[in-house]
A protein has these predicted regions:
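Metal- or metallocofactor-binding catalytic centers and their adjacent structured scaffolds
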Residues: 39-126
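Extended hydrophobic packing segments that form well-structured cores
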Residues: 4, 368-387
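Structured beta-strand/loop patches that form or line metal/cofactor-binding pockets in enzymes
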Residues: 1-60, 65, 348
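General beta-strand structural signal in soluble alpha/beta enzymes
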Residues: 49, 132-133, 150, 208-210, ...
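Shared catalytic-loop signature of beta/alpha-barrel
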Residues: 243-366
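Metal-dependent enolase-superfamily TIM-barrel catalytic cores that perform enediolate-based chemistry
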Residues: 133-255
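Conserved, mostly hydrophobic/aromatic
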Residues: 32, 44, 114, 127, ...
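Short loop/turn motifs at secondary-structure junctions
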Residues: 2, 175, 229-235, 280-283, ...
Length: 387
């Protein structure tokens, strides 16, 4: 059994939404297929993966460095001890051959696209959903339906006919009960009016989260924290620069409520530094590292080891992303909850119709692999990739 081809395709995100820092209208995602010599039903078995949402496609790194390394590797060196499956850890090591340590940026997403395609491939070879493959690999029992909340809460210009209240009411009608909204793209007073508008739909602070997308300096962060503190929100997310651990710790001390961060940290050592210096509290704060931006599920499991070795519960891990791959990761690894982007960040955001949302909980379908083929918004890109 061997890999015969690796294909990649840059797929643009649809919708043109923006947060306080980034406009996503120019963003792309790398969709990858790892094709094998195994033939079933007249077609070669291929694993699909992508590098999550928010960091651009990485075609250059994939084509120039990682795909050639993988195709040059001895086929047996990529297999597990039994020889019947691919070893994602061995694949990742090959992808990173001769890469210097540190600098965990775009290459982390490039590697993740391929590494996660290996998990999809192994699950298809076993004819089982990816969450079962993931759970077995790490000695876990898959969880049942997991809590799901909506990312969203964008800014709407007056006169557009759309409001934040309308957006969140739509999500509630779809079965969601907890909602996340953007802040930092308007003055504090205006943002607080938006928060009150969102609370009218959410019902209480423990069903509402706010996300500053790393925009705030310490002074602004503390001003927001003072206004938000009485509302007892579920969490205050990405307050300042992701690598400003001191700011994170100082806001935590002043704010008292739960904070969430980590989506822009891409390695186990970055996670360790957050734990050491960021003021994060066991049983209280939320870690949002995203496997698709962080070298894949292999490195993400190392991040969880860092958390648990420092007294944190893996249920404090709620990955960024809001897509099918991370849904399987949450179920397979027994994490706290998952995000969803209903109708946003297509064709990758959100889940397939087979993933029923009921009572604010969701579970993957029983399709083999991650079930990306069941997501109709992705079907055209997958057909193009595999043609």
């Amino acid at each position: 059994m061997r890999i015969v081809e690796v294909r990649e395709l840059a797929v643009p995100l649809e919708g043109g939404v923006a947060n306080a820092v980034v406009n996503f209208s120019e963003h792309t995602v790398s969709l990858v297929a790892v094709v094998t010599d195994v033939v079933r039903h007249g077609r070669r078995v291929a694993g699909l993966g992508f590098n999550s949402i928010g960091r651009f496609a990485q075609g250059g790194i994939l084509r120039d460095r990682m795909i050639p390394r993988l195709l040059a590797a001895a086929p047996d060196s990529l297999l597990d001890a039994g020889g019947a499956r691919f070893d994602a850890g061995k694949v990742l090591a090959v992808l990173l051959r001769n890469e210097k340590p540190g600098g965990h940026g775009d290459r982390a997403g490039a590697a993740a696209a391929i590494e996660q395609a290996i998990w999809d491939l192994n699950a298809k070879l076993a004819d089982e959903p990816a969450y079962m493959t993931i759970a077995r690999a790490f000695g876990r029992v898959p969880s049942g339906p997991v809590e799901v909340y909506t990312g969203g809460g964008y800014y709407y210009a007056p006169g557009t006919g759309q409001t934040l209240r309308d957006e969140f009411q739509r999500y509630r009608d779809m079965g969601f009960e907890s909602f996340k909204m953007k802040i930092g793209g308007a003055p504090l007073l205006q943002d607080m009016k938006r928060v009150e508008e969102a609370l009218d739909v959410a019902g209480s602070g423990d069903h509402l989260m706010v996300d500053a997308n790393g925009r705030f300096d310490l002074e602004t962060a503390l001003a927001y924290a003072q206004e938000l503190q009485p509302l007892a929100l579920r969490w205050f997310e990405e307050i300042g620069d992701p690598l400003d651990y001191r700011l994170n710790a100082e806001v935590i001390e002043a704010y008292g409520g739960a904070v969430a961060t980590g989506e822009n940290l891409f390695s186990a050592i970055d996670t360790l530094n957050l734990v050491r210096f960021g003021g994060m509290r066991p049983g209280h704060d939320v870690f949002q590292m995203d496997p698709g931006l962080s070298y894949g599920i292999t490195e993400y499991a190392r991040m969880l080891q860092v958390l648990e070795s420092h007294g944190f519960d893996r249920r404090q891990a709620i990955p960024h992303g809001g897509h099918l791959i991370n849904l399987h990761v949450v179920v397979g690894l027994g994490l706290g909850a998952c995000e969803a982007y209903p109708g946003v960040f297509q064709p990758f955001g959100g889940y397939s119709p087979q993933c029923e949302i009921r009572n604010a909980r969701v579970r993957p379908s029983e399709a083999a692999g991650f079930g990306l083929e069941e997501k109709k918004e992705l079907s055209a890109a997958i057909r193009r990739l595999l043609a």
